[in-house]
From Swiss-Prot:
Superkingdom: Bacteria
Protein name: tRNA uridine(34) hydroxylase
The species this protein was found in: Enterococcus faecalis (strain ATCC 700802 / V583)
NCBIfam families the record matches: PRK00142.1-3
Alphabetic keyword roster: Oxidoreductase, tRNA processing
Length: 316
């Protein structure tokens, strides 16, 4: 394929994130790359797309910088660009865990498990595997038997763990996320919270799916990604669809954002049901005056009224 998507992070010291972000944006644009990079004093977190040649040049330049020389790049072949624009933004932290006291992964983090070791942990009855992603990511795809925290954002995870601490306190804990960066801090936080045996999947789900030993086995569904692809295949052994349509519960792997801009909830649904519900996740959202689906498809007032009448009749 002509294009590649890079997923990477590196905890290191960047003295002036704002100046670095400005320079790095210019560098990325010089290579015609598109994507999103976050920069903080604690390091860098990015996902980029470009031609094979351009992304290879980017990785070479990063590896030549002492701060990023051993960065682990997860590489996905792609048929087209996965992003439309290029952003490099300074932040106070790379991932937000909403902690009273921050965790430095360079000092405290869980043991790294390579894909084959992680697969063994999945099969171990004495190990609890916790998905460190958001609920909508889990619902599209996850490892078999993994715990699904009831959270809409990563910053809600510590509170959820505290509320359910008695279920996991005396267990071996293994965490996983998309590329590994969330687990660096989350696993370190677990150790600080008193959990004694904590490990994490090295390189995240993205690495597990490409590993020649595991080939994504024991993963069900697809992996949610934060770019135009929306999702990617992980299991190359025995693929299974687990996503369910928001409206009728049928198998589904198609994500949309609710058409109500004030809601924006991500839901799995078919084109038929999206059409039927005017892109809304609820009757209230379908009725919203700023409904983006209505605007995008240039629906007339009569067409909108007709569909809403059908939905309202079902609600009654």
């Amino acid at each position: 394929m002509k294009y590649q998507v890079l997923l990477y992070y590196k905890y290191t010291t960047i003295e002036d994130p704002e100046a670095f972000a400005k320079e790095h944006l210019a560098f990325c644009k010089s290579l015609n790359l598109k994507g999103r990079i976050l920069v903080a004093t604690e390091g860098i977190n990015g996902t980029l797309s470009g031609t094979v040649e351009e992304t290879e040049k980017y990785m070479e330049a990063m590896q030549a910088d002492e701060r990023f020389k051993d960065t682990f790049f997860k590489i996905d072949p792609a048929e087209e660009m996965a992003f439309r624009k290029m952003f490099v933004r300074p932040r106070s932290e790379l991932v937000a865990l909403n902690l009273e006291e921050d965790v430095d992964p360079l000092e405290t983090t869980g043991k790294y498990l390579e894909p084959a070791e992680f697969k063994e942990a999945l099969l171990d009855e004495d190990t609890v595997v916790i998905d460190a992603r958001n609920d909508y990511e889990y619902d599209l795809g996850h490892f078999r038997g993994a715990v699904r925290p009831d959270i809409r954002s990563f910053r809600e995870l510590p509170q959820w763990i505290r509320e359910n601490k008695e279920k996991f306190m005396d267990k071996k804990i293994v965490t996983y996320c998309t590329g590994g960066i969330r687990c660096e801090k989350f696993s370190g936080w677990l150790l600080k919270e008193g959990f004694e045996d904590v490990a994490q999947l090295h390189g995240g789900i993205a690495n597990y799916g490409k590993n020649p030993e595991t080939r994504g086995e024991l993963w069900d569904g697809k992996m949610y990604v934060f770019d135009d692809r929306i999702s990617v295949e992980i299991n190359h052994v025995d693929k299974k669809v687990i996503g369910k349509d928001w409206f009728d519960g049928t198998p589904c792997e198609r994500y949309i954002n609710c058409a109500n801009p004030e809601c924006n909830r991500q839901i799995l649904t078919s084109e038929e049901n999206e059409h039927k519900h005017l892109g809304g996740c609820s009757l209230e959202c379908s009725q919203h005056p700023a409904n983006r689906y209505v605007k995008k498809h240039n629906l007339t007032e009569a067409e909108v009224a007709e569909r809403l009448a059908l939905l309202e009749a079902v609600e009654v």
